[in-house]
Amino acid sequence: MKNNRITKIINQYEYKIFYKRIAFTILILLIYILGSKITIVDENAMRQHDSAFYKLAVSNMGGDIHQLNVFSLGLGPWLTAMIIISLITYKNMEKAMHQTRAEKHYKEKFLTLGLSIIQGYFVINQFVRHTDAKRFTELLLLLILVTGAMLMMWLADQNMRYGIAGPMPIVLLSVIKSMFTQSLPIVSIEILMLVVMVILIIVALFILLLTELIEYRIHYRDIIEMPTPGQPTYLAWKINPGGSISIMISLSVFLLLTSTINLIFNMVTGKTPHLQWLSFGHYMGVTIYLILQTVLGYLLSRLIVNTKQNTKDFLKNGNYFIGIRPGADTGNYLNHLAKRLCWFGTTIVTAIIGVPLYISLLVPDLSEYIYFAVQLMIMVYLAMNITETMRTYLYFDKYGAFLNQYW
């Protein structure tokens, strides 16, 4: 009798699925913490040079090169592979939707493996001192780094299926860890300058919060349900559909570009290159990154908005916009609105990230503090996305008992 009563209470508890997902995500994070503690190279064997930009970028993808460990490459190769495959299949979305999960995973894993090898080779050549057994040591370290990257991809994928927010909790933990391990230099700053910096950070965070919360609503007519005056039907898009994932992907692609150019230079000359112009310490490097952030942020936003699918759904359901013919005209109308919205949201995020990076070039003494501020903004952005995902799970948990009757 007592057991039946306990079972009834558990079955009626509306958040049980949500808490299972939280528990699974915590398990994934514990595995990530354990793997990041397994160092594969002694600290004395690491090259100490100015690589703040690379450490910043890697930490925002779940990696860590302060000390080379199993998960040093992070999720960068996987995120890059996903965006490349998504952009390739964008023109033929119907064919991509008919692919099985196994087919999609095979393509992602194969491309991730290749990108991991390129980035891993770059990390070893740039940040590890070479020994007499150079070739054997490089191959062994490369094997460990690539294996760790593939394991991280699997952990993030499992968290996407059974946990909360996919790769974002791993990246958030990596950013927090990186912020606490940074040793900021002591710089004498005037009180006025400090107040201005704090105000600018608060304003930037407030703008990011607005882009995450504000929706762009397009009202339409539903031929099945007549809208009430207080509850009109509308299609809702976020101001920045790409969210924080666009920042992670742009950093990943930028690192892939850096790694590829360094790899080609090393294969041609046989020397370890130091391409300062392709870093956050040079105007060219910052400009290239911001161009990548703008283009990839826009493309990712367009993928998420998916006006092609919206057009098909409207045509199938009989919904329409006033003064717009169904079919091709509706598609052109939605594409026009989506272009303006996605460019607007992407430009805001790029400006918020770009302005501090350019200021760090003008005031090099404050570069470490500016990188710290950028990480703080990215951390808050990730936290907002994770919170929104948790709210979505809570919303569906409330109707779980009803939906399970039909699933």
UniProtKB/Swiss-Prot annotation:
SUPFAM superfamilies: Preprotein translocase SecY subunit. It comes from the Bacteria. The chain crosses the membrane at residues 22-42, 68-88, 108-128, 136-156, 169-189, 191-211, 245-265, 280-300, 343-363, 366-386. One of its GO terms (cellular component) is plasma membrane. It is found in: Cell membrane. InterPro entries: SecY/SEC61-alpha, SecY2, SecY_dom_sf. One of its GO terms (biological process) is intracellular protein transmembrane transport. The keyword Cytoplasm does not apply. The keyword Glycoprotein does not apply. Pfam families: SecY. Its main location: membrane. Keywords: Cell membrane, Membrane, Protein transport, Translocation, Transmembrane, Transmembrane helix, Transport. It is a multi-pass membrane protein. Component of the accessory SecA2/SecY2 protein translocase complex required to export cell wall proteins. May form heterotrimers with SecE and SecG subunits. Part of the accessory SecA2/SecY2 system specifically required for export of possible cell wall proteins. The central subunit of a protein translocation channel. Belongs to the SecY/SEC61-alpha family. SecY2 subfamily. This is Accessory Sec system protein translocase subunit SecY2. It comes from Staphylococcus pseudintermedius (strain ED99).
